[in-house]
Amino acid sequence: MSEERSIDGPRIERAVREILLAIGEDPGREGLVETPERVAEAYAHLFSGLDIDPASYLEVSFAADSHDAVLLRDLPLASMCEHHLLPFVGRAHVAYVPEERVVGLSEIVHLVDGFARRPQLQERLTAQVADALYRTLGSRGSVVVIEAEQLCMTMRGAQKPGTVTVTSAVRGVLDEDPGRRAEIMALISRSERRG
């Protein structure tokens, strides 16, 4: 387990009041009075992954009956980019080939959410999920593809709404065997054809 930390809500509230003052707003005006508290509550949720070791969700597993791939496709995803503390939102596709153990599908959802709920980079998030499935679970291989819109690209900087960033991480047998990797990627791409 990672070192326990907890979100300091009162400190966030004070910081948000200071930000409001710094941008020339009145934190006491109607509409903003409760904003510091709301932001602190939102951050407690958005960064709740800092208080856990997401890989711990893989500790409860079951004997595998096959070595066929397991794929969760189109898993909704939201995280906060660590560069600007703006969201990136999209979907994750997560696959693994069991060795001796499998996990419940909801555990994979919790794994992704645990890594997503922290200041994050999409590239790192993709690798962390793939590594946990490969190393912690001890799978034969894993593939993780994340497609997300980075709001820092949408709202500032390049200002290109709708741009999707795609990252992938491939581990183990799925990295070594082009045929198996292609099979997984074809299954993932079916979601794009569904519309």
Feature annotation, model-predicted:
Residues 1-195:
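A domain-level signal for the structural core that forms small-molecule/cofactor-binding pockets
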